UniProtKB/Swiss-Prot annotation:
Transmembrane segments: none annotated. The lineage of its organism: Bacteria, Bacillati, Actinomycetota, Actinomycetes, Streptosporangiales. InterPro entries: ARFGAP/RecO, DNA_rep/recomb_RecO_N, NA-bd_OB-fold, RecO, RecO_C. PANTHER family: DNA REPAIR PROTEIN RECO (PTHR33991:SF1). SUPFAM superfamilies: ArfGap/RecO-like zinc finger (SSF57863), Nucleic acid-binding proteins (SSF50249). It holds the Pfam family RecO_C. Involved in DNA repair and RecF pathway recombination. This is DNA repair protein RecO. One of its GO terms (cellular component) is bacterial nucleoid.
Amino acid sequence: MSLYRDEGIVLRTQDLGEADRIVTLLTRRTGLVRAVGKGVRRTRSRFGARLEPFTHIDVQLHAGKSLDVVTQVDTLHAYGSVLVTDYPRYTAGVAMLETAEKVVSVEKDPALRQFLLLWGGLRTLAEGAHDPRLVLDAYLLRSLAVAGYAPALEECAHCGVPGPHREFAVHAGGMVCSLCRPAGSVKPSPAAVALMVALLRGDWESADASAERDRTECSGLVAAYLQWHLENGVRSLRLVERA
């Protein structure tokens, strides 16, 4: 087995046998990695606490046939210790971790931009400077954009004619003009659409100045769009407080 080192974020863990744990990581260079942490559930484990969701780690692994093996790990940032103390931030973070795994999906396919987005999102959540819903929605929109599913917000998703347009259709890919609008389209407020644009662009000044009703409407649109475009959806979004 070859030895390699990477930087990663723990997305999910699963107990294996009596003492081991399977860890799913999104790493900077390798992409999505599943590895076994041997003996990490034992009380005297050298690095059990470092292999928990939300933890940003420096990790050394042996490449295996089906699962890699963690041989060394150091904590770079323990975001979970902050997020678990605040329910809105915690649930937003859980949704981000699940989304990252769903968006990347293919193991060991480098996904640097997705890694950087997740790292930045967790760091911003932990800092607590913005509404957790805004941080989550900004992450979801950008992650989808990197994956090739960016919603059309300033032009018609079907014909490309410049907006502004009045209707939004998740199954069509975003805003649609009056000629292209399919059945099931909704009419979001211009302010909610403007907030989506601000979050996608990283315009935090505009996002932070948004009204509560617009944040709630924006969150609903983003959640619906994400669930439509990701296979099997993101279950943890149900836990996020949207109002």
